Amino acid sequence: MLNVTDLRGHTPSKSDIRRALPRGGTDVVSVLPIVEPVVDDVQNRGAEAALDYGEKFDHIRPASVRVPAEVLKAAEDTLDPRVREAIEESIRRVRKVHADQKPREHTTELAPGGTVTERFLPIDRVGLYVPGGNAVYPSSVIMNAVPAQEAGVGTLVVASPPQADHGGWPHPTILAACSILGVDEVWAVGGAQAVALLAFGDDSADLEPVDIITGPGNIFVTAAKRLVRGVVGTDSEAGPTEIAILADDTANPVNVAYDLISQAEHDVMAASVLITDSEQLARDVNREIEARYAITRNADRVAEALRGKQSGIVLVDDIEVGIAVADQYAAEHLEVHTANAREVSERISNAGAIFVGDFSPVPLGDYSAGSNHVLPTSGTARFSAGLSTHTFLRPVNLIEYDEAALKDISEVVINFADAEDLPAHGEAIRARFETLPTTTADTTDTPDATA
């Protein structure tokens, strides 16, 4: 089922690897002309425009953008106890990890009386996007809200598409997760129009704009984020989900097959890639996939994803080359199924998250490992990171020098200012220690304004 790319027999360069690797991705640029008018319309008409687009795309118009408190409470009250237990345990684990991520204020002394203190200040108002679509994602509520809460964010807003099956409100499980987390501002709006409304708000509807928007979404959500970036902050652009598995002949082919299948279940564009130095493992995994995928509930979706150009098996000469291939692929999720898996994992430079060994599968990270599942995709893990407490914090420096400390460094500053031909910078320093000459304006030729 999976296509095979054979890199054996030579040492591939980085360029060779990037050209050879299966990669799908999404062409965000192609949908910008579709999304830009939506964003502009919501900026101009606010909530009314967002509701109009919801009616057009989601085939339902909620009674209001903001979900009433009683609807949130009812969703929590009627939640299946087993689902509630799962949500609460996942919140506990994710909160523990993200609480430990919060950096501490620190001060550096440059000279007696001269210090720089770095403080970490939370963003004031955050918009969290939770998609609808093929599945229900209360886990995305947890993964976005908990790090923001641990950062000390002032206000959280969750936006999620209205659903005709649920009275025009977002899915009840999403609403229940919001209620359990204490998020009481939830908007029944999805897609590009949700991103625009979060960015621009609507004073007439008492919908305040946010300062940053995070959370996954489809290509239209991603395009809208690109258009509003600069008006607000955003997290990294999320393409279709992906898994890479680096494995040798010690790997269990059944487990590897199931992990590839489970990621393909998300989306027909999802990518599932096996990187291995074992031709036997490659054959075994392909056989296990063929034998098992059809019994899953989402078999058609899985099959399309696994047969797509974005998925495949990459054969390499050895694990050394496998590590290089994994680094160039820079997977959203990377599993390592090798002898000495921890040692191999520590040599990986590029991945959104690394899952070490046979008992740390990606589905654990999707829900309850404690790590965050909002991760960079499409190779962007080479230069960006997943969502964390840091996403919602701004480092701010406090510079504090006394007179002696400034005088001690003043000559350096003045010389630098002169080198850059910015003499007023130097004079701003000198004026604190000496009386600088002034120019008295000659008013003899100035017209008398009262004449």
From Swiss-Prot:
CDD domains in the cross-refs: Histidinol_dh (cd06572)
Molecular functions per Gene Ontology: histidinol dehydrogenase activity; NAD binding; zinc ion binding
E.C. designation(s): 1.1.1.23
Region (Disordered): 1-20
Reactions the enzyme catalyzes: L-histidinol + 2 NAD(+) + H2O = L-histidine + 2 NADH + 3 H(+)
Residues that, per the record, bind Zn(2+): Q263, H266, D366, H425
Active site: E332 (proton acceptor), H333 (proton acceptor)
Cofactors, names only: Zn(2+)
Protein name in the entry: Histidinol dehydrogenase
Protein species of origin: Corynebacterium efficiens (strain DSM 44549 / YS-314 / AJ 12310 / JCM 11189 / NBRC 100395)
Origin organism lineage: Bacteria, Bacillati, Actinomycetota, Actinomycetes, Mycobacteriales
Gene expressing this chain: hisD
